[in-house]
């Protein structure tokens, strides 16, 4: 028995004469959706899908496309494209190696004397440092904004907010107090490890006027 699990609903799948499994869901809103398969009671990732870290685990993903209004996050011909690098570094505050995804604008490789402002961009609860560049297509958004003159060329840094596990308050504990500690290890990481590593590795402006932070959902909470 194979179950297709998407957007909080489950749909039983059927096997066709060619041996392929198929199912029909209710209409889905445009945008990106995580999904899972359940095979005889065991939740698995679709082996035919690229995997994405979401909902606190690896998941399949599908995109219900928007019309032309979604062009802002799609790669466009004639637009110079930046790079997203996977950067491993040692975080002394946590005594562990960590990974940051770092976007550099297209001109970074050729304008070798220029320094750049930095945006630290955080993902939502249950996701990781790859969320903005894989699911969110941040690099295409930045490329297009820069090409249109709507954004200054900048470096964008995405790191794990240490919120990969579901938030569960301990019995008898104040929920708001417990929530304030969720992902709190990241605060030491960004101040003591991540920012120093980025400023040492990339051509950045190192003053506070050229450094910003933003985030989605729990990443927004961490920003505040």
Which ranges hold each PLM region?
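Aromatic-rich carbohydrate-binding modules that target alpha-glucans
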Residues: 1-30, 40-65, 92
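Short beta-strand segments enriched for Tyr within beta-sheet-rich domains
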Residues: 2, 31-39, 102, 114-116, ...
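N-terminal cap/lid segment of alpha/beta-hydrolase-fold proteins
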Residues: 14-16, 55-112
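Cap/lid segment of the alpha/beta-hydrolase catalytic domain
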Residues: 94-96, 125-203
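Short beta-strand element of the alpha/beta-hydrolase
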Residues: 100-104, 112-126, 156
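Loop/turn elements at helix/coil->beta-strand transitions in domains of secreted/extracellular proteins
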Residues: 114-118, 150-155, 207-210
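Active-site loop->helix "elbow" adjoining a glycine-rich segment at hydrolase catalytic centers
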Residues: 186, 214-222
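Alpha/beta-hydrolase fold nucleophile elbow
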Residues: 203-217
